[in-house]
């Protein structure tokens, strides 16, 4: 007996030494370099796409969008709609757990939608959910949502990245601090959030999709300088970077260890003008500024060709988008219009940007130079996420300092209402939503509201066309470009890519 035990120990020691002779499997840790900071990890209270994209690490919705921006089931298995368009009955996926062990069920859906649709919570995404009259639990796997009025894009709202399912236990535990303590059903859970440096997430062992996630961790690292972001890829400090500085795209494409990807986008870049303030209350001034910008040159100077001049206020790939003849570059016409408007010598103003990365800086400097040619002196300020939240998103019309504002918008629901209503409806002036032009037109408001009440495609087309025709004519914006999305990644990273709305898809990401 003694001899047998000795042999077992010798065998065990031999096995241990043989294991030690081989390296342990390398951890699959990925660093993603992104262009700006995160504002919050509560998707219902984030106005920026990046914060919502990172929140997809922890959170999932009932529905989502695929790479073509078409609705797909996620935590829902299907739905039906009543004949009057008011009631949505949704069947839920069963056997799913939140990261704190709580069950995902109809009660959890109700807790989230009750919170989102309650104006007393003052959530930035409230406007998405204000049409919900009530949410009821039919049984643990079935939830019934009743709307105040028909809303034909409602499933797209439920597919929006903001509509995340948060653990009700976590909501109760953390309250208003839930943005610092995300708990969802997603593939990763929060490990560290250093608010000035990075968000690190780690694999959630109890994730409901078998075999996923394949990565051990993702570190989301804000890197505002374009050149530094690109350099991190080349040195191996990052395995994925977005956005890629356009001027470095060709260089990165030559790197045998990297893959450069230019993908379609619904990201429209524009400058809004505060039409409630002089001189932008004058239509001739707004026309003049549109004639003053050489968009073809802007595409080359700031975007290295990875963009196209805007032909409307809705990107062409969005349903019901209208295209128009682009504004020609005509500084002489611009000066003539300024003279007619009572500003023969131009004027001074401010031009703010919603981002401070290098591409935004180039757009600001280019625009500043173009405006100077027609006598307009623009003082430029590139804002970080905190400044933008405080000075632009957080202030109403009377206290707002916004005059000209360079920013971008992607309709993250994949449909026309979200491309128009948040930016042009009278009810969506900041701080409610993102109508930073403080634009208001009763016919536009009426058309946008009516388009949501009909399921007739021809009537929708008519209403959305009329609204866009009016907006294009009244010019509360200087539409600039629709971007192409340029990202790059290590060739050994697969399944990680950019969505057309500038969000990220990484469900099946792997490091090989």
Curated annotation (Swiss-Prot):
This is Glutathione-binding protein GsiB. Residues 1-26 form the signal peptide. The complex is composed of two ATP-binding proteins (GsiA), two transmembrane proteins (GsiC and GsiD) and a solute-binding protein (GsiB). One of its GO terms (molecular function) is peptide transmembrane transporter activity. Keywords: Periplasm, Signal, Transport. The lineage of its organism: Bacteria, Pseudomonadati, Pseudomonadota, Gammaproteobacteria, Enterobacterales. One of its GO terms (biological process) is dipeptide transport. Belongs to the bacterial solute-binding protein 5 family. One of its GO terms (cellular component) is outer membrane-bounded periplasmic space. It comes from the Bacteria. It holds the Pfam family SBP_bac_5. It is found in: Periplasm. SUPFAM superfamilies: Periplasmic binding protein-like II. Part of the ABC transporter complex GsiABCD involved in glutathione import. Binds glutathione. PANTHER family: GLUTATHIONE-BINDING PROTEIN GSIB, PERIPLASMIC BINDING COMPONENT OF ABC TRANSPORTER. InterPro entries: Peptide/Ni-bd, SBP_5, SBP_5_dom.
């Amino acid at each position: 007996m003694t001899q047998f035990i000795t042999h077992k120990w010798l065998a065990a020691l031999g096995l241990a030494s043989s294991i030690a002779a081989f390296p342990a499997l390398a951890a699959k840790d990925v660093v993603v370099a992104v262009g700006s900071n995160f504002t919050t990890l509560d998707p219902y209270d984030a106005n920026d796409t990046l914060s919502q994209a990172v929140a997809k690490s922890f959170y999932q919705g009932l529905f989502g969008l695929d790479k073509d921006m078409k609705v797909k089931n996620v935590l829902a298995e299907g739905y039906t709609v009543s004949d009057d368009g008011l009631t949505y009955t949704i069947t839920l996926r069963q056997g799913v757990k939140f990261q704190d062990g709580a069950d995902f069920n109809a009660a959890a859906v109700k807790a989230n939608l009750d919170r989102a649709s309650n104006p007393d919570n003052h959530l930035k995404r409230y406007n998405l959910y204000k049409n919900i009259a009530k949410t009821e639990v039919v049984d643990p796997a079935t939830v019934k949502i009743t709307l105040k009025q028909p809303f034909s894009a409602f499933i797209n709202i439920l597919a929006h990245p903001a509509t995340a399912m948060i653990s009700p236990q976590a909501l109760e535990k953390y309250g208003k601090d839930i943005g610092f303590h995300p708990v969802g059903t997603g593939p990763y859970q929060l490990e560290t959030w250093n608010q000035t440096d990075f968000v690190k997430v780690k694999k959630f062992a109890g994730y409901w999709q078998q075999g996923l996630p394949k990565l051990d961790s993702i570190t989301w690292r804000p890197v505002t300088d374009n050149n530094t972001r690109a350099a991190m890829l080349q040195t191996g400090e990052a395995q994925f970077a977005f956005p890629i500085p356009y001027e470095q795209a060709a260089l990165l494409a030559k790197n045998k260890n990297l893959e450069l990807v230019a993908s379609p986008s619904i990201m429209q870049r524009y400058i809004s003008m505060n039409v409630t303030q002089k001189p932008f209350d004058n239509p001739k001034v707004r026309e003049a500024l549109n004639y003053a910008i050489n968009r073809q040159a802007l595409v080359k100077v700031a975007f290295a060709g990875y963009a196209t001049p805007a032909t409307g206020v809705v990107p062409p790939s969005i349903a019901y988008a209208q295209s128009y003849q682009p504004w020609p570059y005509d500084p002489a016409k611009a000066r003539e219009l300024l003279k007619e408007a009572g500003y023969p010598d131009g004027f001074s103003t401010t031009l703010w940007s919603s981002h401070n990365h290098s591409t935004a800086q180039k757009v600001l400097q280019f625009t500043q130079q173009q405006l100077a040619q027609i006598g307009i002196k623009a003082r430029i300020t590139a804002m970080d996420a905190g400044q933008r939240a405080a000075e632009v998103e957080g202030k109403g019309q009377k206290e707002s300092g916004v005059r000209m504002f360079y920013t971008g918008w992607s309709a993250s629901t994949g449909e026309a209402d979200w491309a128009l209503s948040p930016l042009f409806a009278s009810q969506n002036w900041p701080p409610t939503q993102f109508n930073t032009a403080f634009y208001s037109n009763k016919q536009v408001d009426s058309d946008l509201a009516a388009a949501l009440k009909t399921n007739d495609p021809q009537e929708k087309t008519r209403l959305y066309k009329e609204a866009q025709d009016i907006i294009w004519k009244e010019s509360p914006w200087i539409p600039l470009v629709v971007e192409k999305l340029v990202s790059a990644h290590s060739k050994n990273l697969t399944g990680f890519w950019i969505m057309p709305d500038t969000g990220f898809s990484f469900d099946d990401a792997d490091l090989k």
